[in-house]
């Protein structure tokens, strides 16, 4: 049984009750969204995961990517990133490790959080194929599905799988060449496999078998966008849309089988094209939850891509995206460090909150009203408690204090709020 099959059968699970309460929603209404596939709860049956809802009519959620690379392998560092994710309000974590003992790293990450954990299994497949055969492109079907099954048994809650990379998608790419080609690692692995062997993508060819594996453990399928644009010039081209059409067809199959599914979206999109991209996805994929990387709205800001992504992410979430994958200042430059994780997470949470306010979500507005009340009362402790980052503003206030404990050092004696407040007392 999965959350979706239960919902279709009229069964209300404890996870549904928990998430509905968190979202301030009637549980029957929420259950109906699960049954239709408009909302997912990524929660493997083999793991005691905190239930988190992702999808329409819910608060916008934020994911943190972390993990090793062949150039930097330090489990302690990754666990510190997990700690930061837990502390500053991530809704999910993806382990994208590609260096070191991948099962051991994943095991430690899972052990140190109760947040939903996602992976991209093709990374481990590629590492295993390289170790066994010497080349990533020599991976085979057995290796692919063995890794997926093993990770499902370990408790992974959702998996990015690039099932929409097909011979037809690769043909669309070849017929409409891009500036930057394929920038998705998983997408590149499978594109290279198709081109070298002249074989169909096993994840697409054996999709029914894949669904059986995922359904057994109630792993949520996150349909990866292997043809996402890697620069603004490549946005919304034929390869991207061809893959999205295929993903829409696969969403239908997932729902028929009772497998929870969400769809991943583009990374580099001009601001004026973001709304159209969200509407295309929601239409082709029949309102499946949409999970976007950014989108990044300019390619000119390496070192500041947490900002470019927050700008794009806000509009994306207002226009239909449900799940924002954070982007850190290290994007396009190097592996993220601990401080990068915090900055990227806070930036994405700002985007999510701004979007939820724009959509009129009651919980988002409740927080905004509480902050306004705290500011009006000069209650600095309450302000910092409500803030998305409770640590930074307190430290900043201590750096340049005001003589008046109610005011801040920008205005001091000339504080507008205090001035009008004093006049009101006379």
From Swiss-Prot:
It holds the Pfam family ThiC_Rad_SAM. It comes from Methanococcus maripaludis (strain C5 / ATCC BAA-1333). InterPro entries: ThiC, ThiC/Bza_core_dom, ThiC/BzaA/B. Coiled coil: none annotated. GO terms for biological process: thiamine biosynthetic process; thiamine diphosphate biosynthetic process. This is Phosphomethylpyrimidine synthase. The keyword Nucleotide-binding does not apply. The keyword Transmembrane does not apply. It comes from the Archaea. Pathway: Cofactor biosynthesis; thiamine diphosphate biosynthesis. Its cofactor is [4Fe-4S] cluster. Zn(2+) binds at residues 268, 332. Its EC number is 4.1.99.17. Substrate binds at residues 65, 94, 123, 162, 184-186, 225-228, 264, 291. It is an enzyme of class 4 (lyase). Keywords: 4Fe-4S, Iron, Iron-sulfur, Lyase, Metal-binding, S-adenosyl-L-methionine, Thiamine biosynthesis, Zinc. The lineage of its organism: Archaea, Methanobacteriati, Methanobacteriota, Methanomada group, Methanococci. Binds 1 [4Fe-4S] cluster per subunit. The cluster is coordinated with 3 cysteines and an exchangeable S-adenosyl-L-methionine. GO terms for molecular function: 4 iron, 4 sulfur cluster binding; carbon-carbon lyase activity; zinc ion binding. Catalyzes the synthesis of the hydroxymethylpyrimidine phosphate (HMP-P) moiety of thiamine from aminoimidazole ribotide (AIR) in a radical S-adenosyl-L-methionine (SAM)-dependent reaction.
């Amino acid at each position: 049984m999965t959350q979706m099959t239960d919902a279709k059968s009229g069964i209300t699970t404890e996870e549904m009750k928990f998430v509905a309460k968190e979202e301030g929603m009637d549980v029957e209404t929420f259950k109906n969204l699960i049954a239709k596939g408009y909302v997912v709860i990524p929660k493997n049956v083999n793991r005691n995961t905190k239930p988190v809802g992702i999808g329409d009519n819910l608060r916008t959620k934020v994911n943190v990517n972390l993990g090793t690379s062949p150039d930097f392998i330090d489990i302690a560092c990754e666990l510190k990133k997990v700690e930061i994710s837990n502390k500053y309000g991530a809704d999910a974590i993806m382990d994208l490790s590609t260096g070191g003992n991948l099962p051991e790293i994943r095991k430690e990450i899972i052990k140190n959080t109760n947040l939903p954990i996602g992976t991209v299994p093709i990374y481990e497949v590629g590492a295993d194929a390289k170790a066994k055969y010497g080349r990533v492109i020599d991976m085979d079907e057995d290796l692919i599905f063995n890794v997926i099954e093993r990770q499902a048994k370990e408790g992974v809650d959702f998996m990015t799988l690039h099932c929409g990379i097909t011979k037809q998608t690769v043909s669309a790419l070849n017929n409409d060449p891009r500036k930057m080609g394929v920038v998705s690692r998983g997408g590149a692995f499978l594109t290279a496999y198709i081109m070298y062997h002249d074989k169909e993508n096993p994840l697409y060819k054996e999709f029914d078998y894949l669904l059986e594996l995922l359904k057994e453990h109630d792993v949520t399928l996150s349909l990866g966008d292997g043809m996402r644009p890697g620069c603004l010039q490549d946005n919304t081209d034929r390869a991207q849309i061809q893959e999205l059409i295929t993903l829409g067809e696969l969403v239908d199959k997932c729902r028929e089988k009772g497998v929870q599914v969400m769809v991943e979206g583009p990374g580099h999109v001009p601001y004026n094209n973001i709304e159209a991209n969200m509407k295309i996805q929601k239409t082709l994929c029949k309102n499946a939850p949409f999970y976007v990387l950014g989108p990044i709205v300019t390619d000119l800001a390496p070192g500041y891509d947490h900002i470019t992504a927050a700008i794009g992410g806000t509009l994306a979430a207002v226009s239909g995206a449900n799940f924002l994958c954070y982007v850190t200042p290290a994007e396009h430059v190097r592996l993220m460090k601990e401080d990068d994780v915090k900055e990227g997470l806070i930036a994405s949470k700002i985007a999510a909150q701004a979007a939820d306010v724009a959509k009129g979500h009651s919980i988002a507005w409740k927080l905004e009203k509480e902050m306004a009340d705290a500011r009006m009362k000069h209650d600095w402790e309450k302000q910092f408690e409500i803030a998305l980052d409770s640590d930074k503003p307190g430290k900043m206030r201590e750096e340049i204090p005001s003589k008046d404990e109610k005011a801040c050092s920008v205005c001091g004696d000339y504080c507008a709020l205090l001035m009008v407040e004093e006049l009101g007392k006379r």
